[in-house]
Amino acid sequence: MINPDYLIDYSDWFDEGGYCQVYPIKDKKDLVFKEFRNKKKAQESYRYHKKLAKFDLAPKIYSKICKLEFAKEDDLYQPEPSDWGYVTELARTHTANTKISMADIQHLVDEIYKKTGLKFWDCHWYNVGMVKRGKNKKVVCIDTGKESFDGNSNAWANPDPGPKCSYCEKYECDCCD
């Protein structure tokens, strides 16, 4: 089903991860479309995303699973409609060790587990972002694919999810080497 309420702004930026691409939405600077390679991947991500967003641990969701048309641009190739995905609030990502600290990531990991029972294993800097909540910024999970929660994508190689060592409680240590 093509959602007529939004258009992908193909002339602007886009970003990609291992399982999805993220496109800006035309005339909606704070919304993006997360596109997946198939409907099953989109549905899996949507389920996790919805569970996290319920507790404000992921960007807000603005659509159900759908496809979108690309906005028409003069003198540019007009792609076919997108693959399956959904519209969410834009979360800004940052370079590692800049605006989002290891403590921020660990707090998010702990909140996700406390509120949903999920273990956010793939919690590296490029799988988290910041959203605005009033005048404040909040760190949220932006990779909601099932691989982020299955334990096979352990971003920090600790026995528990997150950058804090489970043994010495430090963020950078040698006790596991």
Question: At which residue positions do the language-model features occur?
Answer:
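ATP-binding glycine-rich loop module of kinase domains
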Residues: 5-59
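Active-site beta-strand termini and strand-to-loop segments that position acidic
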Residues: 24-28, 90, 131
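Short, solvent-exposed loop/turn segments at secondary-structure junctions
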Residues: 28, 38-40, 66-67, 91-93, ...
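Protein kinase-like catalytic core scaffold
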Residues: 31, 57, 86, 138-140
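Conserved structural core of kinase catalytic domains
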Residues: 37, 53-105
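Active-site-adjacent loop/helix micro-motif of nuclease/hydrolase catalytic cores
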Residues: 39-47, 96-103, 150-152
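Protein kinase catalytic-loop region centered on the HRD/HxD motif
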Residues: 110-118
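Catalytic activation segment of kinase domains across protein kinase-like and atypical kinase folds
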Residues: 121-174
